[in-house]
């Protein structure tokens, strides 16, 4: 069986992290979201994957090429006109029943296998959710889909659509007919099929998450490393304390006096310490340096970063290539975060810092602040509002 992965979107609400890459390539658990999907597809009967690419497609194509034993074909959605239109681009690559997966989803292997093994012609994965109004809410009748209500104004129902389906080849004809009325999303196509009497079976997913906003990266990252294996490939000096499951990549050096509590994933070629503290739910990307007496907890530190000594980083995201001076502090707490003209009230959120920034010593960043890509912040500054990409704070 083949799988079609929809990976053409940018993810505007994830800026600045998607300014140089599609959202499916964001790093969680020290690997791209899309790679986690491939891991879930292994040994499920999927032998070929068609990836629908678009925004910054070269980033995906260069990274994956052919992934291990799974053959990959690429088709391009030149204009992002919705998920139904994206799937339509794969029409000439599919001749039998196939699986559709949004590229920004995290889904477990067992759920994919259950979907593949289902005997129904049309099937979909659903998930119970505590805040269903953020998604398409599904209503069922004896396990079959009755209707989908997209992002209702209040929480109704308890199950949502994951956007993961098994379709027959004729879904492409369905899309072409239905899209003439102006429908461009797969959920709307599925809703129309149900209205016209089509039976769509539902299967409850076990583990499923998606990434919509920058802070979702932290939640998904935590889930991805929760069961990280203890692997210590690097060099660990004496008087280092390691508790719980901690993965340390090759050529990484953990200097004396460091205190690390898992789950933690540290990439290859890193330098940690001396006397640094790394606390649970933290990932540190390849070739990064955490200088002495710095504390990092529940954060995503992407590759090629440098964090100065005596710094404190909590509930934060630091994108690749960023250099942070000594005595930096990302304060955590409650704040209202503005994303693409949306305002979200959040608790216990630190800083969200784009790639290739240079931040001087003795800088404090208020909770929930977003610092864009390629920003230059002078020493001894207190950042109390968002900083646009390319800005200088003098």
Per-region residue spans from a language model:
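Short N-terminal binding/cap micro-motifs at the start of the first secondary-structure element
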Residues: 11-16, 133
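The conserved acidic donor/metal-binding loop of glycosyltransferases
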Residues: 103-106
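Conserved donor-nucleotide/metal-binding helix-loop-beta segment in metal-dependent transferases, i.e.
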Residues: 110-135
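Catalytic-core segments of class I nucleotidyltransferases/pyrophosphorylases
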Residues: 116, 141-226
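Extended, small-residue-rich solenoid/repeat segments and analogous flexible loops
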Residues: 180-183, 192-281
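Glycine-rich hexapeptide-repeat left-handed beta-helix
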Residues: 291-394
